[in-house]
A protein has these predicted regions:
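Transition-metal
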Residues: 1-216
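Acidic, glycine-rich loop-and-beta core segments that form the ion-binding/anion-interacting portion
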Residues: 208-238
C-alpha cells in the first residue's frame, strides 16, 4: 500500500470569507465572486476530502469508515474510531460572531439528542453537527485579532456598571456567574438585546469617527462588524 496520498479538500463558502486568497492559493478561478471562507482537509461527514489512490479517486471518510485500522493505524482507530482532527485554512474578511464549544461529554449527548429529534445536520437550528468538542490550535499567517474568553470578574462587573445600557446585566453576573450572564443575554428576545446593543454601537461609531479607538478596544470590533451602518433591528448578539 502507498504511504502518502494526494488529497483534494473542500471549500466552504461562508459569507464572512474573502474572495481572492483561497482561490489564488488553490489555483481556482472565482468566476462567480463567491466568498471562499475555509478550505477543509479531512474526513468530516459534511465535507470529506477526495483521496487519490492507485484505484482512482476515493472519498476519504468512506475509506476510513470501511477500514479504520488500515487508514489510521490500529491505535488511532481504536481510540477515536475516525480521523481525530480537521485541518482548515481560513480567510476571514469580516468579523466573526461568537463561538461556544462544548465539552466532549456534552457534544456526544447533544449530537445524539438532535439525531433522535430528526433535526437535519444542515438546519439553522442545529447546534451539534458531530460528536466532537473541537479544541482548536490556530496559526496566524497574517495579523489576526481574537477575543478569547471573559474578563476577570472584578473588571467585567466594573465594565457592566460603567455603561448605562449594560447595567441591566449586572444582576445576572452576581457571584461571578459567567454561565448565567451568557445564557441570560443569549436567550433574551431580540427586541431586548437590540435595546442594549444599539447604544453600544452608536457610541462605538462616534468614538471611531473621533479617532479615539484602537483595535485593542472591543468597541472598535463592534463597530467594524456593522461598519456599513447599524441595523434598525435584529442586531447580532454575538
Amino acid at each position: 500500500m502507498e504511504k502518502a496520498y494526494k488529497l483534494l479538500g473542500k471549500h466552504r463558502h461562508y459569507d464572512w470569507g474573502g474572495k481572492t486568497f483561497l482561490p489564488n492559493l488553490m489555483g481556482v478561478e472565482n468566476v462567480n465572486h463567491l466568498p471562499y471562507a475555509e478550505y477543509w482537509m479531512g474526513a468530516h461527514a459534511s465535507a470529506s476530502s477526495t483521496i487519490y489512490t492507485s484505484e482512482g479517486e476515493k472519498d476519504l471518510a468512506a475509506l476510513i469508515k470501511d477500514n479504520p485500522a488500515q487508514w489510521l493505524g490500529k491505535d488511532i482507530a481504536t481510540k477515536f474510531n475516525g480521523l481525530p482532527y480537521l485541518y482548515k485554512i481560513l480567510d476571514v474578511r469580516d468579523v466573526l460572531s461568537i463561538q461556544v464549544h462544548p465539552s466532549i461529554e456534552n457534544a456526544v449527548i447533544g449530537f445524539k439528542a438532535e439525531e433522535v429529534k430528526g433535526i437535519a445536520i444542515n438546519a439553522a437550528n442545529r447546534n451539534y453537527k458531530d460528536e466532537n468538542h473541537k479544541p482548536e490550535v490556530m496559526v496566524a499567517l497574517s495579523d489576526f485579532w481574537l477575543l478569547h474568553g471573559f474578563l476577570p470578574p472584578a473588571i467585567l462587573e466594573e465594565r457592566l456598571n460603567n455603561y448605562s445600557y449594560l447595567k441591566p446585566l449586572v444582576d445576572e453576573f452576581k457571584g461571578a456567574d459567567y454561565q448565567n450572564l451568557y445564557a441570560y443575554f443569549m436567550q433574551l428576545p431580540t427586541e431586548a438585546t437590540d435595546e442594549i446593543l444599539k447604544p453600544l454601537l452608536e457610541e462605538a461609531a462616534k468614538a471611531v469617527a473621533k479617532g479615539t479607538l484602537t483595535k485593542n478596544d472591543p468597541h472598535w470590533w463592534a463597530h467594524k462588524y456593522y461598519v456599513d451602518g447599524i441595523p434598525a433591528k435584529n442586531i447580532d448578539k454575538g
